[in-house]
Amino acid sequence: MKAATFAAAASLLASAALAAPTSTLKAAAASKVKFAGVNIAGFDFGCGTDGTCTQTASTVTDPMEGSDGQGQMDHFVKDDKLNAFRLPIGWQYLVNNKLGGDLDETAAGKYDKLVKGCISSGAEMCIIDIHNYARWNGQIIGQGGPSNDEFVSLWKQLATKYKDNTKVAFGVMNEPHDVPDISKWADTVQAVVTAIRNAGATTQYILLPGNDWTSAAAFIDNGSAKALSNVTNPDGGTDNLVFDVHKYLDSDNSGTHTDCVTNNIDDAFKPLADWLRQNKRMAINTESGGGNTDSCEKYFCEQIQYLNQNADVFLGYTAWSAGGFDQTYELVQTPIKQSDGSYKDTALAQKCTVGAWANA
């Protein structure tokens, strides 16, 4: 999520066993995407677009504690029949601000409760998302900042920890942007993929992010598609390597406005679908959303319907966002807890995130 959302998150912070995935090269015809769900935000609060993340084990916004993240996920799965959650977290938090260091027992333990909560909800995909914008404290990974080995160290540990659960997917990095050399970034992604597979996570999905905030509209023209197409598993294949794309629907594609102006089909998802089909690959939309407004209900539903109609190349989507966001946040999809303990979805979640998938 981009800068203004970081600001909203910072404000909140201040105030507050599935069968192995099938090959991405052999997607069966389907009436809708395989995975649909939401982000469960909180552990990423305090992370800026420059790759600084300020939360510690004592200050963290833990969606499992303050926001009943377990109850939210249980509701989305059991009541709404969604089946996927993306679980954003800051790199620094996981290693207690020690670049290249071991997972911090306390911090990683808190996050592990969220991952296990996702699994226990019955979800079929639980995405670990490192929410650092291809950076550590302002410096780009593999391009003047942290070395590839230091980034690989994080992913090797996470893959080792979760290698035996095929519901866990690995989202290499949230929204790389202004990366000078996309080929070098692809080398970084390749190093991570190799480390994850060699750690024993041989079948899980790995999500590959491109440049320009991993924009679905820019993915082909900015060279991300070409560069990331060269990323392979150790056996040379690309099974379960899925391109990770984002796209918002407001006037500047920032995901900071409550009004939507486009369904992103003609300028983003149709060209991407054509390219994916030609190249026998798949993508997943792990961030998108809008306000609880008539315009967003129209356009966001149309976008999801298009993804469903092209499920041979789109694996799924996770909307932004539920978890630690309260009802004042512009793009909130956090369900509202009722007096009887049940949950009521926001308007956009009910109509589009849930409805456009459930009714496909």
Regions found by a protein language model. Give the residues of each.
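Extracellular glycoside hydrolase catalytic/binding regions
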Residues: E65, D149-T160, D164-A169, M173-L315, ...
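Fungal secretory targeting signals
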Residues: M1-T22
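Extracellular low-complexity, O-glycosylation-prone Ser/Thr/Pro/Gly-rich "stalks"
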Residues: L18-N39, F45-P63, Q327-A360
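A generic structural motif
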Residues: T5, Y317-A322
